[in-house]
Amino acid sequence: MRYESDPNKYDYPYSGYLYLEYQKQKKLTNSSNYSFGGQIGITGDASLARGMQNLYHDLVLNLPHLKWESQMPQELQLNFSASYFKGFNIKDNISITSELYSRLGTYQIMSGLEVGLFIGDLPWLGFSDNFIINGDSKLSFFIGTKQEFFLHDFKLEGSLFNEKADLVMESNNYRNLFLFGFKKNFKDLQILASYNSMSKDTNNQRTKRHPFLKISLTYNLK
């Protein structure tokens, strides 16, 4: 169905989101912190998603371009975010981590809880964070889950304020994700890699779960 031109047969709307994000994190104790921030971005053609995906098809996959029929409309998006992280040390280099997080705005309205087990020498700041705390060459492993509840998701449902979207789908309110991976620090360079298995965003999706690999590189500019 990759090259299907009839949007009525799609299992997920085409959608792109290009944004700038600001996030400020405040340490409360050696095992807890909170953060807050926001995003301002654009959806639709201005997100450049269509061009980037088809460029990937040209340069990497050597496949024809995707149709991108009835993609989500071009609109300005504004979102705010907040989170609270708490870790619980079990014994040396073994910790349980937890994080409550929420997003509120035109693109998404949701809340989630991330819980997992962190094993290793690197500071435990959550699975998605790749901040460099120190320059020591260390390694950590993690396994965990994210349990999320969505009230609104633009990439499936379109705007809260108008009916411009050509194709919308019912969003699953409850979603979950399971992941495992590692963080490795090489002094000024840190790598985060994880394998993820995500539940359906909408019941229209043909596969029960969506697996994907996430790789993040962080470099400390001195």
Where are these regions (language model features)?
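Outer-membrane pore/translocation modules
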Residues: 1-132, 152-170, 197, 222
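Outer membrane beta-barrel transmembrane domains
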Residues: 2, 122-222
